[in-house]
């Protein structure tokens, strides 16, 4: 990273940390956190393709394609250390009971993906960082519905990065949990409703909100599509507590 990029990233991190402390979420973009100019184009070409992403029977939305990795990270005095976690299995998530495995992408073998992971983990304010944790990295390509209903991921932080979008809709929303009953419609306006454009990023503290996105809207001359990197800064109970 150049000196100018590092300086920009430092200023961007200060604002992100302040926004997270003040309101529980922060909107930013790839330039503000110091990602290289061609990063999104190169990352999208490498990973958002039919050789990497797969559709799974029983998944929801039914036309979603996906892949996944889980990173084990540790913060030491000399900085951030990362390695591949030994499993990527998810259990009882997104309203689907049981254990599920998806295609694994070994991100740490790729320098650009490793840079993204380091950059995203640095978005977490220093005082909120776990010394030893796991970081879920999901690639989602969606064509109609992005999600089904407002929900929690039951993790510490969520990070969404939009790599590409064709068409409209897909407006990300955050509701206060008390404003979304388990059954029925929200009883108040969302705290945030924002259409994330390619290159934009949101990070939020998961316990403070129920989140989701509106359906994609196809352009007049084609098919809608959104490519997104969806990451979770996991609680220990997701992987590490069970392993210990």
For each feature predicted by the language model, list its residue ranges.
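N-terminal auxiliary "cap/dimerization" subdomain that precedes the catalytic jelly-roll/cupin core
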Residues: 1-94
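Generic detector of solvent-exposed, compositionally biased contiguous segments
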Residues: 2-11, 67, 74, 78-79, ...
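Intrinsic-disorder/low-complexity, polar/charged segments enriched in Ser/Thr/Lys/Arg/Asp/Glu/Gln
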Residues: 27, 156-158, 228
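Structured loops at beta-to-helix junctions and adjacent beta-edge loops in soluble globular domains
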Residues: 31, 76, 140, 162, ...
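Short, solvent-exposed loop/turn segments at secondary-structure junctions
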Residues: 32-34, 142, 164, 179, ...
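Signature of the catalytic double-stranded beta-helix
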Residues: 72-134
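Catalytic core of non-heme Fe(II) oxygenases with the double-stranded beta-helix
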Residues: 129-196
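Catalytic core of Fe(II)/2-oxoglutarate
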Residues: 173-244
């Amino acid at each position: 990273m150049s000196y100018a990029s590092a300086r920009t990233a430092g200023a961007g991190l200060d604002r992100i940390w302040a926004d997270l402390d003040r309101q529980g979420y922060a909107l930013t973009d790839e330039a503000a956190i110091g990602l290289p100019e061609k990063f999104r184009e190169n990352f999208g070409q490498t990973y958002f393709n039919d050789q990497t992403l797969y559709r799974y029977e029983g998944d929801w939305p039914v036309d979603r394609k996906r892949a996944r990795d889980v990173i084990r990270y540790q913060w030491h005095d000399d900085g951030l250390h990362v390695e591949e976690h030994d499993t990527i299995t998810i259990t009882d998530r997104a309203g689907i009971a049981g254990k599920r495995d998806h295609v694994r992408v070994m991100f740490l073998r790729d320098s650009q993906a490793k840079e993204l992971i380091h950059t995203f983990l640095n978005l977490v304010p220093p005082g909120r960082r776990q010394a030893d944790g796991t970081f879920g990295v999901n690639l989602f390509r969606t064509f109609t519905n992005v999600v089904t209903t407002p929900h929690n991921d039951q993790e510490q932080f969520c990070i969404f990065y939009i790599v590409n979008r064709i068409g409209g809709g897909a407006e990300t929303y955050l509701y206060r949990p008390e404003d979304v009953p388990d059954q029925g419609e929200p009883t108040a306006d969302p705290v945030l409703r924002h259409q994330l454009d390619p290159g934009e990023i949101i990070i939020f503290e998961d316990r403070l909100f129920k989140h989701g996105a509106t359906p994609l809207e196809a352009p007049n001359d084609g098919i809608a599509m959104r490519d997104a990197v969806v990451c979770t800064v996991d609680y220990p109970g997701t992987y590490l507590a069970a392993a210990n």
